[in-house]
A protein has these predicted regions:
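Divalent metal-coordination and catalytic microenvironments
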Residues: 3, 31, 59, 79, ...
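Active-site-proximal beta-strand elements of phosphoester/diester hydrolases
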Residues: 25-33, 73-79
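Pre-active-site segment of Zn-dependent metallo-hydrolases
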Residues: 29, 34-48
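Short, Asp-centered acidic motifs that coordinate Mg2+ and/or phosphate
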Residues: 27, 53-54
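Short beta-strand scaffold segments in enzyme catalytic cores
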Residues: 17-20, 64-67, 91-95
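Binuclear metal-dependent phosphoesterase catalytic core
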Residues: 22-23, 45, 50-52, 76-104
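Active-site environment of divalent metal-dependent phosphoester hydrolases
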Residues: 5-11, 34-39, 56-68, 82-87
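Core catalytic region of metal-dependent phosphoesterases/phosphodiesterases
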Residues: 1-24
Length: 104
C-alpha cells in the first residue's frame, strides 16, 4: 500500500488499503486512518464492512496501541522506524497472531 509521500508511479501500482486475514483475524492496513474516536473519513465504514479486528495505520509517526471497544478491534500505529522525519525515536511493534488471538 502507498503513503502520502509516495508519488504517482507507486500509487498506480499499489492499493491505498490492504485487507487480509491472518490466523482468523481480519486486518485492515492503511497509511492515513486516524485512531479510535478520531478516524479518517470513510475508515469506520471499511472497518465495519470487513469485520476488522486489527486496524493498522500510521501517518502521525506517533506510537499508539489502543482498543476500540465500540468496533471491537485493536488499533496499532507503529510510529516511525525511518531515519528521516521529525521523530526523535525510531519505533516499531512486534506482536503475535495465533488462532484468532492477538497478543504479546
Amino acid at each position: 500500500m502507498y503513503g502520502n509521500i509516495d508519488g504517482h508511479p507507486l500509487r498506480v501500482m499499489l492499493p491505498k488499503t490492504l485487507i487480509f486475514n491472518v490466523e482468523g483475524v481480519e486486518v485492515l492496513l492503511t497509511h492515513i486512518g486516524g485512531y479510535p474516536g478520531k478516524y479518517a473519513p470513510g475508515i469506520i465504514q471499511q472497518l465495519r464492512s470487513n469485520n476488522t479486528r486489527l486496524f493498522i495505520s500510521g501517518h502521525s509517526h506517533i506510537l499508539k496501541v489502543m482498543n476500540d471497544n465500540t468496533l471491537k478491534l485493536l488499533h496499532i500505529n507503529p510510529g516511525a522506524a525511518g531515519i528521516y522525519g521529525f521523530h526523535k525515536v525510531r519505533t516499531l511493534i512486534r506482536f503475535c497472531i495465533d488462532n484468532c488471538r492477538i497478543y504479546d
